[in-house]
């Protein structure tokens, strides 16, 4: 705030008593009065209004006047030489006078004026006379007419008259036909009656006039220049005039006249008919093409060879694969250059010659349409493998679950045989990605692609790609795979994945086996070649470990079956011996009882009827005791069988668990332990009959003791046999 403002607020007088200077007055400019849309547009500008260009009220731009003197025009006479009247008609028109006229009175000026007067007296030719082009009609002599142009319906005079009219009216045929009035000449001499003879003129149509003129022109054109020396336009004109047909021209005009006279309904109907005809023609053409293709496929040379080899399923499958290979090799264009200078056509011929006669005859069938691009065989390797191993080849296309089964079934064999193939031929290059792994052991047999058919279409043919050698593929890093992975991976990670799919015991065995071969488990420099060879070695080692495991499993099963067989034989032998001893004991007891009775009878010598009754009662009681003892033995035997079954269920775990291999991963030690347990059980069961025999020899007469020995023996045999049978069933599952 300044002192002046403070004084003003406090109403104090200023230091300077003089009047305050007045502000500069602003000039009030008239604001444009906008209305309607212009005002709305102006308001959109806000603080920065849009600049509006003022309207200019100028009606017409001022004319630029030249300061040169005005040009002079003069009325001059002219004639038209195209009329052919030698300048009889003289016309006049205004023409601009040329500049540079001399106005002084010198001699040169007088001479130029005199020349101008002379030129003014003689009218000039019209500038449009140069556009008058005369038609050149054929010219001929008397001899040429008599030789080439004679016609029974035309005379030479009438032909000359026609050519004159054509020349005068520039081949405008409607005018020529309208002005054509030929009157034949009267014959010389007088008739016997003294009357004049007036020959009648023949009526001529426009087509007759055209036909005669074109005939004369074509023949004279051929006389002046033979057809073999004519240029292409000249020969086309010659052919057109020579083949002019007056009847066809009349029909064309009549058809055009009728077309112009038809109604709108007839025009629409005719248009619909034309569309239907086009549709029918297109359908007929397509049908003819398909029928021609079918005929070409069915038309094949008859085979004279024996067809017995194709009556079996294997022969038919082999023939199918051969035909597929030949068909694909014909349809697929080769992407590789011919090797050793052998053209693809010669290679295809050699491949067809190598086929069986019947297959070659079928393969020689023509193909429609002719394929410009031929494909290589996609199933050559699978066919070769099927022929080498006498197995039915894989069907094309393979089913998914069949592919998985064949892959799991031939995994071990494919690894070992792939190792041989890699070692002998380096990296295997596959021509097809659809080859199934069911027959990976065989090396692929590439079928050379035949030469592509000559491409008659316009445009240059694409060059074929050159095939790289093995060294070039190694240099450029080119490789071929059965299938591509999900993404980029490191080679050592790829090797680690091989270990991750195995159990700990199998990993330990594989590692020990590799250490025996002086090969580290982790590669130091895993290049592509080293990794491939390591995968081959890994496959061979895995196959060897699996075979060892299967061998141990089979050995354990053999030992178990032998122990079961020995136990069955021992049990049968002991049962037979026990039956023989029982019969002998029963016979001895009966003999002893009979002898005692005789002695008593002898000692009694005359005993009464009471003693006899007592003795008979005692014998009856002895028989009842024997029967009771037999019943008790049978009952005890049934109880032994029931107890044996209970002990068998309880002992299954003890006998079956050592035999199981823990998911297929335990080795020889578990099988040996199972065999040892079986032998111990057999020995313990075999000791039971010995104890029984010792008890019998010591005079043990108690039936319970004898039955207990037999019970223990039968129990051990039944438990071992039943447990072994159930363990065998579980192993089979």
Swiss-Prot record:
Biological process, per Gene Ontology: chromatin remodeling; DNA repair; negative regulation of transcription by RNA polymerase II
Highest taxon above the source species: Eukaryota
The keyword Nucleus is annotated on this UniProt entry: yes
GO MF annotation list: transcription corepressor activity
Chain ranges of the SANT domain: 146-217
Major place of residence: nucleus
Subcellular location: Nucleus
UniProt entry tagged with the keyword Coiled coil: yes
Basic and acidic residues bias (residue ranges): 387-423, 463-484, 564-589, 610-653
GO cellular component terms, A-Z: NuA4 histone acetyltransferase complex; Swr1 complex
Ranges of compositional bias, category Low complexity: 371-384, 699-710
Keyword list, A-Z: Activator, Chromatin regulator, Coiled coil, DNA damage, DNA repair, Nucleus, Transcription, Transcription regulation
Stretches the record annotates as Disordered: 1-34, 98-128, 371-488, 564-733
Residue ranges that the Swiss-Prot or TrEMBL entry lists as coiled coil: 247-299
Matching Gene3D superfamilies: Homeodomain-like
Function: Component of the SWR1 complex which mediates the ATP-dependent exchange of histone H2A for the H2A variant H2A.Z leading to transcriptional regulation of selected genes by chromatin remodeling. Component of the NuA4 histone acetyltransferase complex which is involved in transcriptional activation of selected genes principally by acetylation of nucleosomal histone H4 and H2A. The NuA4 complex is also involved in DNA repair.
PANTHER family, A to Z: DNA METHYLTRANSFERASE 1-ASSOCIATED PROTEIN 1, DNA METHYLTRANSFERASE 1-ASSOCIATED PROTEIN 1 FAMILY MEMBER
Protein family per UniProt: Belongs to the SWC4 family.
Record text on subunit structure and interactions: Component of the SWR1 chromatin-remodeling complex and of the NuA4 histone acetyltransferase complex.
Name under which the protein is recorded: SWR1-complex protein 4
Source organism per UniProt: Neurospora crassa (strain ATCC 24698 / 74-OR23-1A / CBS 708.71 / DSM 1257 / FGSC 987)
Gene: crc-1
């Amino acid at each position: 705030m300044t002192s002046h403002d403070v004084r003003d607020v406090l109403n104090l007088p200023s230091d300077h008593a003089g009047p305050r200077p007045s502000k500069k007055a602003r000039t009030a400019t008239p604001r444009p009065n906008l209305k309607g849309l212009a005002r709305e547009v102006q308001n959109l500008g806000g603080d920065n209004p849009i600049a509006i260009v003022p309207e200019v009220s100028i009606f017409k731009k001022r004319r630029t006047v030249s300061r040169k003197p005005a040009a002079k025009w003069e009325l001059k006479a002219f004639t038209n030489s195209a009329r052919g009247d030698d300048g009889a008609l003289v016309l006049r028109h205004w023409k601009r006078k040329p500049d540079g006229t001399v106005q002084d009175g010198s001699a040169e000026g007088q001479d130029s004026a005199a020349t101008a007067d002379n030129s003014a007296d003689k009218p000039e030719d019209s500038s449009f006379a140069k556009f008058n082009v005369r038609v050149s009609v054929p010219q001929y002599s008397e001899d040429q007419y008599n030789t080439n142009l004679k016609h029974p319906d035309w005379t030479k005079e009438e032909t000359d008259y026609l050519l004159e009219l054509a020349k005068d009216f520039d081949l405008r045929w409607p005018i020529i036909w309208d002005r054509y009035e030929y009157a034949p000449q009267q014959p010389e001499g007088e008739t016997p009656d003294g009357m004049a003879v007036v020959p009648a003129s023949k009526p001529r149509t426009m087509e007759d006039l055209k036909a005669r003129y074109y005939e004369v022109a074509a023949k004279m054109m051929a006389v002046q220049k033979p057809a073999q020396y004519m240029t292409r336009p000249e020969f086309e004109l010659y052919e057109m005039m020579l083949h002019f047909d007056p009847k066809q021209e009349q029909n064309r005009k009549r058809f055009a006249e009728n077309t112009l006279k038809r109604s709108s309904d007839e025009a629409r109907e005719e248009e619909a008919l034309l569309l239907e005809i086009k549709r029918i023609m297109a359908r007929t053409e397509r049908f003819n093409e398909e029928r021609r293709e079918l005929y070409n496929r069915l038309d094949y040379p008859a085979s004279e060879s024996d067809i017995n080899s194709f009556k079996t399923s294997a022969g038919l499958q082999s023939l199918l694969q051969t035909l597929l290979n030949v068909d694909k090799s014909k349809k697929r264009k080769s992407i590789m250059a011919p090797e050793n200078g052998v053209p693809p056509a010669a290679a295809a011929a050699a491949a067809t010659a190598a086929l069986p006669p019947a297959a070659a005859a079928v393969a020689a069938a023509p193909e429609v349409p002719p394929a410009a691009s031929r494909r290589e065989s996609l199933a050559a390797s699978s066919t070769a493998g099927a022929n080498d191993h006498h197995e039915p080849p894989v069907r094309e296309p393979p089913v998914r679950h069949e592919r998985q089964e064949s892959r799991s079934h031939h995994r071990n064999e494919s690894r070992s045989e792939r190792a041989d193939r890699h070692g002998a031929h380096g990296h295997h290059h596959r021509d097809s990605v659809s080859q199934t792994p069911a027959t990976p052991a065989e090396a692929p047999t590439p079928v050379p692609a035949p030469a592509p058919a000559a491409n008659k279409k316009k445009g240059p043919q694409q060059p074929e790609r050159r095939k790289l050698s093995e060294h070039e593929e190694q240099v450029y890093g080119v490789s071929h795979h059965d299938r591509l992975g999900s993404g980029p991976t490191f080679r050592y990670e790829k090797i680690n994945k091989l270990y991750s799919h195995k159990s700990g015991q199998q990993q330990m065995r594989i590692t020990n086996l590799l250490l025996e071969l002086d090969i580290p488990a982790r590669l130091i420099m895993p290049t592509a070649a080293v990794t491939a060879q390591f995968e081959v070695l890994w496959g061979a080692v895995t196959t060897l470990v699996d075979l060892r495991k299967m061998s141990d499993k089979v050995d354990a099963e053999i030992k178990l079956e032998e122990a079961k067989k020995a136990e069955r034989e021992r049990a049968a032998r002991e049962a037979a011996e026990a039956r023989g001893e029982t019969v002998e004991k029963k016979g001895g007891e009966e003999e002893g009882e009979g002898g005692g009775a005789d002695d008593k009878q002898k000692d009694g010598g005359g005993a009464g009827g009471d003693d006899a009754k007592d003795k008979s009662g005692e014998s009856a009681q002895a028989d009842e005791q024997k029967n009771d003892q037999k019943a008790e033995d049978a009952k005890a035997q049934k109880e032994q069988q029931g107890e044996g079954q209970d002990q068998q269920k309880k002992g299954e775990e003890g006998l079956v668990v050592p035999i199981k291999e823990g998911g297929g991963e335990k080795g020889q030690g578990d099988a040996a332990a199972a065999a040892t347990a079986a032998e111990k059980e057999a020995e313990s069961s075999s000791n039971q009959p010995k104890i029984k025999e010792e008890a019998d020899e010591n005079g043990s007469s108690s039936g319970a003791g004898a039955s207990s020995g037999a019970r223990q023996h039968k129990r051990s045999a039944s438990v071992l046999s039943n447990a072994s049978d159930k363990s065998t069933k579980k192993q089979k599952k």
